[in-house]
Curated annotation (Swiss-Prot):
Family designation: Belongs to the lyase 1 family. Argininosuccinate lyase subfamily.
Reactions catalysed, as given in the entry: 2-(N(omega)-L-arginino)succinate = fumarate + L-arginine
Organism encoding this protein: Pseudomonas putida (strain W619)
InterPro entries (UniProt xref): Arg_succ_lyase_C, Argininosuccinate_lyase, Fumarase/histidase_N, Fumarate_lyase_CS, Fumarate_lyase_fam, Fumarate_lyase_N, L-Aspartase-like
Transmembrane segments: none
GO terms, molecular function: argininosuccinate lyase activity
Biochemical pathway: Amino-acid biosynthesis; L-arginine biosynthesis; L-arginine from L-ornithine and carbamoyl phosphate: step 3/3
PROSITE patterns referenced in this protein's UniProt entry, alphabetically: FUMARATE_LYASES
Protein name, per record: Argininosuccinate lyase
Swiss-Prot/TrEMBL keywords: Amino-acid biosynthesis, Arginine biosynthesis, Cytoplasm, Lyase
Intracellular or extracellular location(s): Cytoplasm
Enzyme Commission number(s): 4.3.2.1
Single GO BP term: arginine biosynthetic process via ornithine
Amino acid sequence: MSTDKTNQSWGGRFSEPVDAFVARFTASVDFDKRLYRHDIMGSIAHATMLAQVGVLSDAERDTIIDGLNTIQGEIEAGNFDWRVDLEDVHMNIEARLTDRIGITGKKLHTGRSRNDQVATDIRLWLRDEIDLILAEITRLQQGLLEQAEREAQTIMPGFTHLQTAQPVTFGHHLLAWFEMLSRDYERLVDCRKRTNRMPLGSAALAGTTYPIDRELTCKLLGFEAVAGNSLDGVSDRDFAIEFCAAASVAMMHLSRFSEELVLWTSAQFQFVDLPDRFCTGSSIMPQKKNPDVPELVRGKSGRVFGALTGLLTLMKGQPLAYNKDNQEDKEPLFDAADTLRDSLRAFADMIPAIKPRHAIMREAALRGFSTATDLADYLVRRGLPFRDCHEIVGHAVKYGVDTGKDLAEMSLDELRQFSDQIEQDVFAVLTLEGSVNARDHIGGTAPAQVLAAVVRGKALLASR
């Protein structure tokens, strides 16, 4: 008969119950209960393996698995009583299992520790989250390709230092976003490979004395490999840090997209219009239509950056193997994944619906001497050194600033005062269409290259 003074699974060594505040302070069930499905998945695989190696009978295995499936149904129906005094998702499920099936439920934890159990749960959860995030990236990229194809010939100003630089097509600009997201996709796929390694079987830190078959459990759970060292298996959180790093880069990209959309929807730019369903108004200013979705995505990027910093700080001082500090890994990881997925979903819904204002974009591209480089290149083709051409065009631009004329608005005589190499054919070079069409190479802004890039992009998405 037990003489424990506590109802905890580890209570045998203790002579008094945990302080009520300490129980609440140390409990993680309020946030780690979202791991229930993966915890049950891991337990079913563990029970299956224990039966295979003779630690459990087939009947015990079946009873445990039936009980776990019933518990999952209770949780999903909202009929499960989560108890803080049971600390975490693992002990809540195990206690309920024992309530349902009796002493057999107490055999499930044979050859296992919560240390390798939680490490397995998190990896299973994150693996699924990465798959969902990858799907949202692909959906957003599909929207970008569709917009880029429609806007392959829409001319807008390209910027450096947020100053007019050269004409580009709107489709070309959208494809820059596509390229960033392709790198994000690759990083997350790579992260998933290292996430998909199984720590289960490491037990507390040194392994277990039971004749477990880790390869079988690995196969049952769909992991690619077994963690090769039990100390590292229970204490490794590199995969979570790596995910938050990849998520941070992706959120940085979305934040940059957001900044451009905020600028472009302003009265000062008016390049694009966002549908009302992605905006909100003001409680005092009746005229306002605020781009809340991109603004919030821009703001939420800081949450993900904070998660990365938090996890790095969490891990930097820990000796091997598991420490209670690691309980703090879940909330930043969960929040980073939720934030990235929600932000991608918002953009994937919004991007296909944005409406470019072609005339305003074109008019903006006509300002700021955007074809100055084209004039310099024209002179280079006439045999002049580029640095001399740069100087000549600089003088022409200064003249344009003083007279209020763009280069294309100057007469041939006005242009020839800066170089007698300039002829009538220069005006074809100085048009917006001439400028973008001249950049007809892989990665260039020419409409033909934009359409070719769209074809390559569609092939990339189809190969996933």
